[in-house]
Amino acid sequence: HGYVDQVTIGGQVYTGYQPYQDPYESPVPQRIERAIPGNGPVEDLTLLDIQCNGSGGSGTKPAALIASAAAGDEIAFHWTTWPSSHVGPVITYMGKVPSNTDITSYSPTGSDVIWFKIDEAGYENGKWAATDIMSAQNSTWTVTIPKALAPGQYIVRHEIIALHQAETYPGAQFYPDCFQVQVTGPGTETPTSQALVSFPGGYTPTTPGITFNVYSGSITSYPIPGPPVWTSNEAFSGGSSSSAAASSTAVASSTADSSSSAAATQSSSAAASGSAAPSSSAIGTSTASSAAASGTAIVDANTCMNNYNKCIDAGQPDPDWSGCTATKDACLAGATYQRLARSGTLGRLSF
């Protein structure tokens, strides 16, 4: 299990939505990422939750802020601790917000065919994108906004599909995160209808790659779900994706992908009203130490969840779900929620 806890857009660092911290803050922090309920997956392809995460089928709500980026800029997504058992593809889509609509109030419906794929990576040379490749990149995945893309407001949908239980449907686990970006630049192209899908609708139980046995022992390729990658209308070939190759995603620089990186420089000017300023500090996945026997130990909720992931990972392919869950729940019962202290350091609020 996991989620994107930090994103670097055009060289600027933004803190992602923190599901175990933000809801308990007052006021609730404003983000460029749409809220997610936690680090768990979506498994039902018919629910609106498959679009940008959520629970109960209602999806998620727009975020308050917008990041600014030029067409051709890179976006680097930093993930929380990702279990090595959760093999699968890493896929990124973008969806253009309709004209005369503000992204901070726009929630696509399941019938809105707006999503086009800008990056994908699956299985190549014995390595899975979500585990082998991403872990070698400090839990970071980097994509490029197509240079040909016309200016406008876009939702960037970044996901991992975990295949460790995908022998049948339902089984595959989907982890989508959505970010709000104002794209600038001289680009003039909008993807044609052949490149667009809806969510739900972009994947079905019979889509190649949705069911897949990763334990067969004879894997040579993997059919990545969804349409082909769009970089321009001229380059787009149409049809269904059958790519099994890892993308040419570049390794993010150490200043963009590290959860312990130094504070980002404040942007000298906002791109537009409601635009997000870069994070004043890079919040790591977990800064609290592991649970200790001492009653004075401060345990961050993210540490509880990361230890839960490791417990599940260690028991694959048949983990002790009840035991790992009980340990997680006991940890969370006494956990605190990591936040920025007034001193600017991570920890409990100091007064």
UniProtKB/Swiss-Prot annotation:
Q: Which residues bind O2?
A: H164, Q173
The biotechnology note for this entry reads: Lignocellulose is the most abundant polymeric composite on Earth and is a recalcitrant but promising renewable substrate for industrial biotechnology applications. Together with cellobiose dehydrogenases (CDHs) an enzymatic system capable of oxidative cellulose cleavage is formed, which increases the efficiency of cellulases and put LPMOs at focus of biofuel research.
Bound cofactor: record note: Binds 1 copper ion per subunit.
Write out the catalysed reaction. [(1->4)-beta-D-glucosyl]n+m + reduced acceptor + O2 = 4-dehydro-beta-D-glucosyl-[(1->4)-beta-D-glucosyl]n-1 + [(1->4)-beta-D-glucosyl]m + acceptor + H2O
The entry's propeptide annotation covers 281-351
What is its cofactor? Cu(2+)
Picking any one GO molecular function of the record gives: metal ion binding
In short, the EC number is: 1.14.99.56
Q: Which cysteines are joined by disulfide bonds?
A: C52-C178
Give the top-rank taxon of the lineage listed in the UniProt record for this protein.
Eukaryota
Q: Which GO terms describe its biological process?
A: cellulose catabolic process
Alphabetical UniProt keywords = Carbohydrate metabolism, Cell membrane, Cellulose degradation, Copper, Disulfide bond, Glycoprotein, GPI-anchor, Lipoprotein, Membrane, Metal-binding, Monooxygenase, Oxidoreductase, Polysaccharide degradation
Q: How does it sit in the membrane?
A: Lipid-anchor; GPI-anchor
Entry-linked Pfam families: AA9 (PF03443)
Attached lipid, kind GPI-anchor amidated serine, located at S280
InterPro entries the UniProt entry points to: AA9 (IPR049892), AA9_LPMO (IPR005103)
Annotated Cu(2+) binding lies at H1, H86, Y175
- Gene Ontology CC terms: plasma membrane; side of membrane
Mainly resides where? membrane
Similarity comment: family membership: Belongs to the polysaccharide monooxygenase AA9 family.
Q: What does this protein do?
A: Lytic polysaccharide monooxygenase (LPMO) that depolymerizes crystalline and amorphous polysaccharides via the oxidation of scissile alpha- or beta-(1-4)-glycosidic bonds, yielding C1 or C4 oxidation products. Catalysis by LPMOs requires the reduction of the active-site copper from Cu(II) to Cu(I) by a reducing agent and H(2)O(2) or O(2) as a cosubstrate.
- The name on file for this protein is AA9 family lytic polysaccharide monooxygenase A
